A protein has these predicted regions:
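Alpha/beta catalytic cores of nucleotide-metabolism and tRNA/nucleoside-modifying enzymes
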Residues: 1, 22-54, 59-181
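Short, small-residue-biased leader/transition segments that mark boundaries at the very start
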Residues: 2-9
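Gly-rich Lys/Arg/Thr-decorated short loops/hinges at beta-loop-alpha junctions or inter-strand turns
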Residues: 10-20
Length: 181
């Protein structure tokens, strides 16, 4: 495509240890929003649209929705796909960023076998932890916030609220269910 470029934005994947080892890094939402802002400036200056692809730690449909709302055009979901029964890694995910002495592609992380590829992507979900039916979760997030298209959703006003990760989860944690696992 003329006038379109793609740029992957690696943040910190499931198998990546760089942030912990080096003690540096940029939080996912900030990095995506900054890249999306730079994309707009680049488009204004050159007329070339650069796709932002968020890569790093995408586990749930909520993670995917947040990445899109922050401005990503697409996300990489290595670990969720590796957990599909059909995945060639048989429940393992190989990270690209982390060195490993015997594996040419980085660290090998156990993703487990959770569900079929169809269940992971489009459901039905047989667990309520957000790791199944990723597309359904994205659609529900968009509908709940009043957006009909991905392009509209990319322009959503985003508020960072760390309490959302723990608020109202005490019963789930106590019972080891849902997002409290």
């Amino acid at each position: 495509m003329t006038g379109v470029q793609t740029c992957a934005l690696p943040i910190s994947g499931h198998a990546c240890t760089s942030r912990g080892v080096l003690g540096i890094g940029v939080p996912q939402a900030t990095a995506i929003a900054d890249a999306a802002g730079a994309r707009i400036r680049h488009l204004d200056e050159t007329g070339v649209y650069v796709h932002v692809i968020a890569d790093g730690g995408m586990r749930t449909g909520g993670d995917v929705a947040k990445a899109i709302a922050c401005g990503a055009d697409a996300v990489m979901i290595g670990s969720p796909l590796a957990a599909a029964y059909e995945a060639p890694g048989r429940g393992y995910h190989w990270g690209m960023a982390t060195f490993h002495p015997t594996l040419p592609r980085g660290a090998r992380v156990k993703a487990g076998n959770r569900a079929t590829l169809a269940e992971i992507l489009v459901g039905p979900a047989h667990e309520n932890d957000g790791t199944l039916n990723l597309f359904g979760a994205l659609r529900t997030s968009m509908a709940t916030t009043g957006y009909e298209t991905l392009k509209e959703f990319q322009k959503a006003e985003v508020m960072i609220a760390p309490a959302l990760q723990t608020e109202g989860k005490s019963l789930q944690r106590a019972q080891g269910i849902g997002m409290g696992q």
